[in-house]
Regions:
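Charged, cofactor-coupling segments
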Residues: 29-145
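Active-site cores enriched in adjacent His and Asp/Glu residues with nearby glycine-rich loops
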Residues: 1-41, 64, 69
Length: 145
């Protein structure tokens, strides 16, 4: 689906075609209640400010993590037909994208996994007793009961 130098593709923002959203955000008592304070106050600080590049501008958490913070970790991959068509028509990122192959995924939709993470003194801890199945074996075992 992609070609060329990975670092150059990321620097150009090519990944935003597949993940035009942030990777996660702060959590309060509810999943999104911290957003009402304004992302600039919650997800950023005086040292770290938002970036205005498409895709990267959707990052909602850039501040230094501290013990006691609870954040979401939400990697995802989407194939948004209108966005694919727009980028292809404009010839965007053609040095990094293989549009003919991407076209075959337009009916896929997308998927996003989410974990809620507690930041501790020594690292982090995934909250909750069970993760969603993510490997092929885990998904098949879940489907087959």
């Amino acid at each position: 689906l992609m070609k060329g130098d990975v670092n150059a593709a990321v620097a150009a923002g090519t990944h935003a075609l597949f993940m035009p959203h942030g990777l996660g955000h702060m959590m309060g008592l509810d999943v999104h209640d911290m957003e009402d304070l304004g992302q600039i106050y919650v997800g950023y600080d005086d040292e770290t400010r938002p970036i205005d590049q498409f895709g990267t501008s959707s990052l909602r958490m850039g501040r230094k993590l501290q013990p006691g913070f609870v954040v979401t970790d939400e990697p995802g991959c989407y194939f948004i037909p209108a966005l694919i068509d727009q980028w292809k028509e404009q010839g965007l990122h053609k040095d990094f994208l293989v549009y003919d192959k991407i076209e075959t995924y337009k009916d896929f939709g997308g998927i996003r996994l989410e974990d809620d993470i507690l930041i501790t003194e020594n690292g982090c801890k995934c909250m909750g007793d069970h993760r969603a199945p993510i490997t092929v074996e885990e998904v098949e075992n879940t489907i087959n009961g």
